[in-house]
Amino acid sequence: MLKIIIPTIMLIPLTWMSKPNMIWINTTTYGLLISLISLFYLNQPNDNTLNSSLMFFSDSLSAPLLALTTWLLPLMLMASQHHLSKEPLTRKKLYISMLILLQLFLIMTFTASELIFFYILFEATLIPTLIIITRWGNQTERLNAGLYFLFYTLMGSLPLLVALLYIHNFMGSLNFLMIQYWIQPLPNSWSNIFLWLACMMAFMVKMPLYGLHLWLPKAHVEAPIAGSMVLAAVLLKLGGYGMMRITTLLNPLTNFMAYPFMMLSLWGMIMTSSICLRQTDLKSLIAYSSVSHMALVIVAVLIQTPWSYMGATALMIAHGLTSSMLFCLANSNYERIHSRTMILARGLQTLLPLMAAWWLLASLTNLALPPTINLIGELFVVMSSFSWSNITIILMGINIIITALYSLYMLITTQRGKYSHHIKNIKPSFTRENALMTLHLLPLLLLSLNPKIILGPIY
């Protein structure tokens, strides 16, 4: 595990010691090298886990998320160059250091083999994210967004700490590898119901569950581009990962406790998709679409069948790359037009034809067009939820239709129509931006050729 963690730590001195004109090039190329190392973890030759040390392990659930995390750092650096071009040098270096620190915490969170260690790192990811949002965001509302983000996450995860200490007290260990062999069924008592809620709430807030999702659109809209990318792509996946890890402890209570949360997710999925249809703000639309996709993952994890777990893992990876790409596209519009309102950015296809192609591809992957892995994940989730209850097929069908509607609405509003006069002399798309979009789309297309490497622990 150290062969990823130590190079990531060494990125920080690299940032501070590079020449001013070489900072971006050095950190990006080095970050890409680290992400290539992490691809080795995707090859899981045997059924049991890779125990790198007492603290770190990697299995077929954490490996895809680990690869996604390392892959995203160079992409964030590529996307942030324009945003930081006017900043003084030290502030640029601080920003890059924050991103590297966040990546370090995320890598360690996904590979921690002990639940308390996992919890500490899960909370540590909050600090760099908060600094990135509140220091480099665009509007003054970013402070409000940071407060929302901080308090929602902390209020959700403090009960988890108490619950973990309680579990540790009567189990004697919180190591993932030990827990598997100690599973005693939790009976339906009030104390166990509260234990279940305390364990799940932290991850439900992080996912976010409909009703606890108010921090997400705020944080996404106010964050700078790298903040939005890492929030959508990796931080939401922490919730799904934590849920998949901790549900094994809480059986058979989950079967009994999952109903209200399933209902809330299925209802919230349709509600947030419908909210997307009446958004004027581009970033806000993409943020709400993330909530609706993550609701599918919550449903899948709570059903607890092998198929639904496979669907949840595939959907998490697919959504990470897709939403990150959409945020990059929204940002490239914002850098030219200086507004997130979609109506002001209409008719861009005539001015930026290549960008329009990227918009089309990103929208199609977002609405889960075959043969992308978004479709594979959604199919698994839809099929497993149908076998859990037949009624869900109606809700899932409505959701898929609305998803297609808002994806195409986003595409048509920004790309078609007559462009307004204030955007006649905008800059053309840079090679950097085209490379960025390619690096988002390439993994999505390549994974559709061999989806089994991201189907998680069951496959």
UniProtKB/Swiss-Prot annotation:
Membrane topology note: Multi-pass membrane protein
Record's keyword terms, sorted: Electron transport, Membrane, Mitochondrion, Mitochondrion inner membrane, NAD, Respiratory chain, Translocase, Transmembrane, Transmembrane helix, Transport, Ubiquinone
Reaction equation(s) it catalyzes: a ubiquinone + NADH + 5 H(+)(in) = a ubiquinol + NAD(+) + 4 H(+)(out)
GO BP annotation list: aerobic respiration; electron transport coupled proton transport; mitochondrial electron transport, NADH to ubiquinone; mitochondrial respiratory chain complex I assembly
Residue ranges crossing the lipid bilayer per the database entry: 22-42, 60-80, 93-113, 114-134, 147-167, 193-213, 224-244, 256-276, 284-303, 308-330, 351-371, 391-411, 435-455
Gene Ontology CC annotations of this record: mitochondrial inner membrane; respiratory chain complex I
Presence of the UniProt keyword Transmembrane in the record: yes
InterPro entries attached to this UniProt entry: NADH4_N, NADH_Q_OxRdtase_chainM/4, NADH_UbQ_OxRdtase, ND/Mrp_TM
UniProt subcellular location: Mitochondrion inner membrane
EC number, UniProt record: 7.1.1.2
Keyword Metal-binding: no
First-tier enzyme category under EC: translocase
Domain of life: Eukaryota
Gene Ontology MF, one: NADH dehydrogenase (ubiquinone) activity
Function: Core subunit of the mitochondrial membrane respiratory chain NADH dehydrogenase (Complex I) which catalyzes electron transfer from NADH through the respiratory chain, using ubiquinone as an electron acceptor. Essential for the catalytic activity and assembly of complex I.
Assembly and binders: Core subunit of respiratory chain NADH dehydrogenase (Complex I) which is composed of 45 different subunits.
Entry similarity comment: Belongs to the complex I subunit 4 family.
PANTHER family associated with the record: NADH-UBIQUINONE OXIDOREDUCTASE CHAIN 4 (PTHR43507:SF20)
Protein name: NADH-ubiquinone oxidoreductase chain 4
Name of the encoding gene: MT-ND4
